[in-house]
């Protein structure tokens, strides 16, 4: 990270984070990281950015719609890093393949509705409850955090039609 900020002259780094690792630790980089070690790693990255007057995006690096573990992680991150001007929140990395329950071939409008409001979706053949982006944002704000939040469009973030169709005009 030092090289990226100091040698390359970067002003911003996107740090992929995983809610399962945040909650339980992980086997990562051939090391068995505990929850505490994983969270310290993220904290060290945030401190490095802040010490240099740079920025870091904490990027929830999953493609499937947010679920309860994502929401829980964002609540904790909002408390820990809320109003830290070095930290931006990437709510969900490149969402795609949003399949509402009971819909064979979902339209873009149906996918955007789930993106915004959440709902029951199929993931890997199983029904799960998706948390909408508005709920994520609401929970972050309830914790008192005013950090910039980044919300990508559908289909690996290429489809931003929902923003053009009014999702950006809803209260947040």
State the predicted function of each range.
Residues 1, 55, 67, 71-81, ...:
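Extracellular glycoside hydrolase catalytic/binding regions
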Residues 2-76, 80, 129-143:
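Aromatic-lined substrate-binding rim segments of carbohydrate-active enzymes
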